[in-house]
Amino acid sequence: MTIMRKSHPLMKMVNHAFIDLPAPSNISSWWNFGSLLGLCLIIQIASGLFLAMHYTSDTISAFSSVAHICRDVNYGWLIRYIHANGASLFFICLYLHIGRGIYYGSYLYKETWNIGIMLLFLTMATAFMGYVLPWGQMSFWGATVITNLLSAIPYVGTDLVEWIWGGFSVDKATLTRFFAFHFILPFIIAATAMVHLLFLHETGSNNPLGIPSDSDKIPFHPYYTLKDFLGVILVLALFLTFVLFFPDLLGDPDNYSPANPLNTPPHIKPEWYFLFAYAILRSIPNKLGGVIALVLSILVLALFPLLHTANQRSMMFRPISQFLFWTLVSDLFILTWIGGQPVEPPFIIIGQIASILYFSIILLLLPIAGLIENKILKW
């Protein structure tokens, strides 16, 4: 008699994806972030569901309903802070996951990589709309400034912005639709993540050496289920420590003031995980140019498979590319810092140099480094 997990139609799918899946024997902890992103999504959907039970998407009562959740709902404060900081954890895991993909050449699985970029866009859209919901000062002005960027699109821009707003300014209609989209998008993300995994399992995982691992595979369970579980325990411990001891560290104090259309905050800025893109947007003095640079700062990831010139897949044995990769990481830290600073010297020029360097490394220097390394290694 066949084992149930190998014969039952539903169990068979789970078995092929998480139990009998052949996995490379040498994948490191950098491969843990995929499962951690799944964990983040589950945490966000669960905590978000409980918040939605008590939240009111109305301009008059939205801010009060969040205060009510924190004060009057049993463990409401905990659910709210788990959800708010869960977004930060989500983006930390997301950026590390993308960084791993770039370093080890995982982007050569084109379908998986492109679905991943779609997931990044969906997650960014979800996070942006979620930030608007508490209806604090930074929520309101962040929504106004970011949606207003679409008015830079020639001819249809203004109509498009008013269509998104549902009126002539960010108001009740905007808040209601943002809540609706913020609720539905995580489920779309979950479905897209399934497609991401489907494409990944067509090819199998990459590994740190960037060489085919068909000759040395091990079953996913128990080896990687246990390894992923260890990652989950460690990350949850760090996450809960952060939530319980420093819940407001990453938030903006302005968001503790109710939204006021008549009073603009001195420095409008998004959450920390968007600051690098915000810095690139601000580094170009032209509105349309800035919007194009903003979109390209993420879309440029799609060019990685096309710009891969090296004969080796991974950067593990490519010192020049390694140096450029870590320069790119440092550059992103600088852009994140600049995104949170006011638009004044010397921050303007630092932001512009960092933005030029960001695109130069990806579009020019890494492909050249690949060719040089081919020559050095006589490939």
Swiss-Prot record:
Pfam families: Cytochrom_B_C (PF00032), Cytochrome_B (PF00033). Component of the ubiquinol-cytochrome c reductase complex (complex III or cytochrome b-c1 complex) that is part of the mitochondrial respiratory chain. The b-c1 complex mediates electron transfer from ubiquinol to cytochrome c. Contributes to the generation of a proton gradient across the mitochondrial membrane that is then used for ATP synthesis. Binds 2 heme b groups non-covalently. The lineage of its organism: Eukaryota, Metazoa, Chordata, Craniata, Vertebrata. It comes from Chaetodipus eremicus. One of its GO terms (molecular function) is metal ion binding. It is found in: Mitochondrion inner membrane. Belongs to the cytochrome b family. Its cofactor is heme b. A ubiquinone binds at H201. Heme b b566 binds at H97, H196. Keywords: Electron transport, Heme, Iron, Membrane, Metal-binding, Mitochondrion, Mitochondrion inner membrane, Respiratory chain, Transmembrane, Transmembrane helix, Transport, Ubiquinone. This is Cytochrome b. The cytochrome bc1 complex contains 11 subunits: 3 respiratory subunits (MT-CYB, CYC1 and UQCRFS1), 2 core proteins (UQCRC1 and UQCRC2) and 6 low-molecular weight proteins (UQCRH/QCR6, UQCRB/QCR7, UQCRQ/QCR8, UQCR10/QCR9, UQCR11/QCR10 and a cleavage product of UQCRFS1). This cytochrome bc1 complex then forms a dimer. It is a multi-pass membrane protein.
